[in-house]
Design a protein with these regions (language model features):
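Feature marking well-ordered beta-strand scaffolds used for ligand recognition
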Residues: 20-255
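Bacterial Sec-dependent N-terminal signal peptides
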Residues: 1-31
């Protein structure tokens, strides 16, 4: 948990500094009009959507009103399941990863999250589930190790979410100890214990492996932000230039 908060603080600082360097007023306007949703990684335990903060612990989803930032107010606590790991916002939905399934909640009523469905991978029995989504597809990394309850496969799972009430796993890719993930345009970035994997998702349900970026680092999570990829590693935060989305170029490392 200590490393999660360190990443959150460093990411906030980096994103703020990147935003301050933007001189194009249209870019600034687009950022400001992004629904008030905070930037966060796929392994986060909290996210901000509009005027609400959503957090998860091992079993529950909690909703806080941020109408008064000085005094957040707990509005609701919703039982989700067991061994909850991550939370990720997508439009008016929350994707909540656990060691057994991905839960999908509607936040059409932001103070009363409603469970819509669950997504289960037939490939592994127990795992850690960072998850992201866009349009009609969701991607989850399913990591099987002692921390996540054992199992036999670590994979990148691809879900068809066109019917949000009945998500279906379309395909998967075998990986070695995957962690967080993020996407920019038609590229998907997956943090792993052995490097940063880059995939083309031009065909969204069929990720095509492009390359692995190895910097002698154990990658935990990534946040694409414009033409910059913010990567959280075991030894600090690395910034990559992703002007060429399929070929991240090292910029600097923040210890």
């Amino acid at each position: 948990m200590k490393y999660l908060y360190q990443f959150f603080l460093l990411t906030t600082i980096v994103v703020f500094n990147l935003q301050c360097t933007k001189t194009d007023s249209a870019d600034a306007g687009n950022f400001a009009s992004n629904g008030g949703t905070g930037t966060g990684g796929s392994t986060a335990r909290f996210t901000i959507v509009g005027n609400y903060l959503y957090t998860v612990d091992k079993q529950n989803l909690k909703v806080f009103s941020l109408s008064n930032l000085a005094e957040p107010v707990l509005k609701n606590t919703v039982s989700v399941g067991f061994e909850i790991e991550t939370i990720y916002p997508f439009k008016d939905k929350l994707f909540i990863g656990s060691t057994s399934v991905v839960y999908i909640f509607s936040i059409t009523n932001p103070e009363i999250p409603e469970r819509l469905s669950t997504a289960i991978s037939p490939n592994v029995l127990r795992r850690c589930d960072p998850v992201i989504a866009r349009d009609t597809v969701a991607y989850a990394t399913l990591r099987t190790n002692s921390e996540c309850g054992g199992g036999t496969q670590s994979i990148l799972a691809v879900y068809d979410i066109r019917n949000i009430a009945n998500p279906v796993q379309k395909t998967f890719r075998n990986l070695q100890e995957p962690y967080g993930l993020g996407f920019a345009d038609t590229c998907l970035y997956v943090a792993t214990q052995t490097g940063l994997n880059v995939y083309s998702i031009a065909t969204e349900y069929n990720p095509v492996f492009l390359r692995t970026i190895r910097n002698q680092d154990w990658f935990f999570d990534v946040i694409p932000y414009g033409n910059t990829l913010i990567a959280w590693t075991k030894d600090g935060v690395i910034l990559f230039d992703i002007t060429n989305k399929g070929n991240p170029a090292f910029i600097t490392k923040i210890i």
